[in-house]
Amino acid sequence: MKTLLLTLVVVTIVCLDLGDSLICYMGPKTPRTCPPGENLCYTKTWCDAFCSIRGRRVDLGCAATCPTAKPGVDITCCSTDKCNPHPAHQSR
């Protein structure tokens, strides 16, 4: 009986731990599991001095809170697995 109870406890802990792991894109085709406590994916886009040549810069990643937008910087946040694909790789 104790073995069954211990097994159930271990299975419960493993299942709860897996449920908290969010997967976000860190690059155009690079999904990674976020560290504990970082439960949001973000996409940050902006223009720099070379925007007319190479287009908008893109930063993807995980965050505990949605980063604060600054003038000229667009940020979107989401909370489901792989919800922040690189804008160039989104299906149309």
From Swiss-Prot:
The record's disulfide annotation reads 24-41, 34-62, 47-51, 66-77, 78-83
InterPro entries the record matches: Snake_3FTx, Snake_toxin-like_sf, Snake_toxin_con_site, Toxin_cobra-type
Q: Spell out the SUPFAM superfamilies in the cross-references.
A: Snake toxin-like (SSF57302)
Tissues/organs with expression:
Expressed by the venom gland.
Q: Does the keyword Lyase apply?
A: no
Q: What function does this protein fulfil? A: Binds with high affinity to muscular (alpha-1/CHRNA1) and neuronal (alpha-7/CHRNA7) nicotinic acetylcholine receptor (nAChR) and inhibits acetylcholine from binding to the receptor, thereby impairing neuromuscular and neuronal transmission.
Stated name of the protein: Long neurotoxin 77
The source organism is Drysdalia coronoides
What are the leading ranks of the lineage? Eukaryota, Metazoa, Chordata, Craniata, Vertebrata
